[in-house]
Amino acid sequence: METRDDLRNVAIVAHVDHGKTTLVDAMLWQSGSFRENQDVAERVLDSMDLEREKGITILAKNTAVRLGGTKINIVDTPGHADFGGEVERGLTMVDGVLLLVDASEGPLPQTRFVLRKALEQRLPIVLVVNKVDRPDARSSEVVNEVYELFLDLDADESQIEFPIVYANARAGKAGLAPDDLAPDLRPLFDTLLDAIPPPAHDPGHPLQALVTNLDASPYMGRLALLRIRHGVLRKGAPIAWCRASVT
């Protein structure tokens, strides 16, 4: 098996309104994904009218940022329990998770649900304590509550030893201590690259990919979002699509 050291696949999971989509916006801006004069709306990945109206993510969305020679594929998952299937779908695409928790509210019911799913898949986790700028922030207590949640979910010793990053996603700042944030998200990017492993695959194996979402474009027709597990996908190559129940 070979590893793609130039890639990272990560999902951002959290309870609703803990700042996932705001953090993705900041990561996109700071990675140079937009031109300085480009007019970009807030909540870039929220494309549905209901998502923008309610300020929530309903469907798992994907985007990517480039940091030096590394491409970071990011999946923004829903933060509401009613869309748990989308969370599970997103976790099949990644090799690690950014668990975002509000520095005041701490872990809430959906935090427990998404964390359980990530632990079941044995995905490495980076804890991001967001909104540390809030007047009622209680970062140290929240970290302890997250540790207790890991123990309550029967996480083993290796899973409990997770790195912690503190952030103010709206301001685009992060750091390794709640009272010492860098002027940008560099500490978060560095921790992500160090803690999330690169994907492994066998390029000599026949093509094997998992389709996680379908879409349509007026210009390109039907689109399939997939993760390549093994092999190589080449333009013009004939591909057989199979349902999971087909042997």
What are the residue ranges of the model-derived segments?
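Structural and coupling elements of P-loop NTPases
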Residues: 1-247
